[in-house]
Amino acid sequence: MVPVSLRAPNTGAGGNRVGVLMCNLATHLSDPAHRLETVRNCMNEGKAALQAMSPAQVLAMSALGAAPLGVEMFLGRRGPLRPPFNVVISNVAGPRTPLYWNGARLESLYPLSIPTTGQALNITCTSSDDQIVFGLTGCRRTVPDLHPMLDQLDAELDLLETAVGL
């Protein structure tokens, strides 16, 4: 599941306009360029579909994916339904210029998230000052050791950068 901003650029209006997409992560594909293309196409198609909906339609569609969590909150215990996803991936755009506090430059800004019931892993990346960093938060029962995932993430990013010529 990927939360996406649906706010039009330069509107100046307050508030959030957010929807959620289910994205094919293409983990079944061995070619990194093909994986990246598949994810990009899936996200572009999903965003276009959400942009074509009214705010009420986006809310209703997004609520379908969160329905199992709502049932659990209502019942006060794990409900009979499981969420249709157990991985959330999010990107939070940060400032493009360096930040300082008392003259000290901020070197990195690492994101943090809180997994909800039924969620195994949250991957949030954030950008600041022309760099991007990743924060991984996992359910200790489902993902007892996140460290190997960091190594795999570094290796995958290297493959993707090579595939696109960076």
Task: Report each predicted region and the residues it spans.
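Short proline/glycine-enriched turn/loop segments at secondary-structure junctions
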Residues: 9-11, 75-79, 112-113, 124
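Flexible helix-coil linker/hinge segments at domain or subdomain boundaries
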Residues: 48, 155-166
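Low-complexity, glycine/alanine/valine/leucine- and proline-rich hydrophobic stretches
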Residues: 83-158
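Small-residue-rich loop/turn and linker elements
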Residues: 1-13
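Solvent-exposed residues in well-ordered beta-strands and their adjoining turns
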Residues: 5-7, 24-30, 128, 137-141
